[in-house]
A protein has these predicted regions:
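C-terminal segment of N-terminal export signals and the immediately downstream linker at the start
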Residues: 23-57
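Catalytic domains of carbohydrate-active enzymes, especially glycoside hydrolases
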Residues: 53-71, 129-130
Length: 300
């Protein structure tokens, strides 16, 4: 990614001739520095079949960033990363000109018993891949199924502790939402409200899954306005125009991504990862279609 100095040099302008406000300049930088990423869960079956070919195809489409997932056993990703250890994957990503800004890590054990040993091992993996964010992909099963105010407060405490551990190891902790966190609990609170309130803004960022936010009936822009700067990453995936439970390629559904992307600075967005949980066409055609829409219409 280009530095601020590189941007000015390549634009052929200097500070003396820069007749735009700092806020506009920041928006230009956000756009010029935005690498479009993909959550690799989108092509999980293809990775299991041929990790090298799949990553090459991802790079050929134009993606520059990938978000990994790790710790889910043979069915999801085999040993390590589809038979590769972290060093081998890091080298393969480098070969294809890919970087990994974030990784999803299986934190079920930690969120259940508070044991940090697995976290420490996974943090080593994240650092080997030069990732910036260690991302908790889902809530503890008991809280997901039977969430309470106290349950979410306990999760917030565990997030803060994990966030401190990540910070001490050069990473930032993030949490990836689904729709259930927005269900109303006691005193008209939601689980997401509690996580926002009870976690340290310096220790936890959120990876906002736009699909699940809209599925829950929540306006993403309202979240940005109420919690400015907390949504460092987004999962960008679209929703079928007739069925809010069906995924579709970005730009073909009902989610107003143009307005959402206009508010990236307000959200604090640093990374975007295209994702589609279920695909009904050739997966590489699908992700190429979503990539093309994002590049041509959302990232200038």
């Amino acid at each position: 990614m280009n530095s601020r100095r590189d941007f000015i040099k390549k634009s052929g302008i200097g500070f003396a001739g820069l007749l735009i406000t700092p806020s506009i300049f920041n928006n230009i930088l956000l756009d010029s520095k935005q690498d479009i990423g993909i959550q690799l869960f989108t092509v999980r079956e293809q990775l299991n079949q041929d990790v090298k070919l799949t990553l090459k195809k991802i790079a050929d489409i134009g993606f520059k960033q990938v978000e990994t997932f790790y710790g889910y056993g043979d069915k999801m990703s085999g040993k390590g990363f589809w038979g590769l250890d972290a060093k081998e994957l890091a080298q393969l990503l480098k070969t294809y000109g890919l970087k990994s800004g974030s990784g999803h890590y299986n934190t079920t054990q930690y969120l259940t018993d508070g044991n940090t040993e697995v976290l420490k091992q996974q943090i080593e993996v994240a650092n080997t891949l030069s990732q910036k964010y260690y991302t908790i992909p889902a809530m503890a099963p008991n809280v997901r199924q039977n969430g309470t105010v106290d349950g979410y407060k306990k999760m917030a405490d565990l997030f803060n502790k994990a966030g401190e551990l990540c910070k001490n190891n050069g990473l930032t902790l993030a949490y990836h939402n689904h729709a259930f966190e927005f269900a109303t609990l006691e005193h008209k609170q939601t689980g997401f409200d509690i996580l926002l309130k009870e976690t340290d803004i310096k220790l936890l960022k959120f990876e906002l899954d736009i699909f699940w936010v809209v599925n829950a009936g929540i306006d993403p822009i309202t979240l940005f306005k109420q919690n400015e700067g907390r949504f460092a990453m987004w999962h960008v995936k679209d929703m079928d125009k007739t069925d809010n439970k069906v995924f579709t390629e970005v730009g073909t559904g009902r989610i107003d991504y143009k307005t959402i992307f206009e508010n990236r600075k307000l959200a604090g967005n640093k990374f975007i990862f295209i994702e589609q949980d279920v695909i009904k066409k050739d997966p590489f055609e699908s992700i190429a279609q979503s990539f093309s829409y994002v590049k041509q219409n959302l990232v200038k």
